[in-house]
From Swiss-Prot:
The keyword Protein biosynthesis does not apply. GO terms for biological process: maturation of SSU-rRNA. GO terms for cellular component: cytosol. This is Ribosome-binding factor A. It comes from Pelotomaculum thermopropionicum (strain DSM 13744 / JCM 10971 / SI). Pfam families: RBFA.
Length: 119
């Protein structure tokens, strides 16, 4: 990713996080953290990865609510970030934190069953 793309992605991440915290009042949007943003080379498309705390149903509901708010969020981005074109945004669920927790739990389970043989 080019330096400009990285800067734009960071700016989008910062602004969307701020909007989620201060401006969106949808009760379906729970504990959301924007983990990363990927921007296309031409800066016209942005995939926004969000980590959602809660059950799988809560996660799905939150992502759906974010998708419904895409128009508002994109409009606000256009006002806050000076670009020739405001990127089309897509929200995606980032499951890497959940996977990492699962891997750590499995490693702990193996360590307990193995009786600490490699210590």
């Amino acid at each position: 990713m080019s330096f400009r793309s990285e800067r734009v992605a960071e700016a989008i991440k910062k602004e969307v996080s701020d909007m989620l915290r201060n401006e969106l009042k949808d009760p379906r949007i729970g504990f959301v953290t924007i983990t990363s943003v990927e921007v296309s080379k031409d800066l016209r498309y942005a995939n926004i990865y969000a980590s959602v705390f809660g059950s799988p149903d809560d996660q799905k509901e939150t992502i759906e609510a974010l998708k419904k708010a895409q128009g508002f969020i994109r409009g606000e981005l256009g006002k806050r970030i000076r670009l020739r074109y405001t990127p089309e945004i897509t929200f995606k669920l980032d499951q890497s934190i959940g996977r990492g927790s699962r891997v750590l739990a499995l490693m702990e389970e193996v360590r307990e069953k193995g009786g600490g043989q490699d210590e």
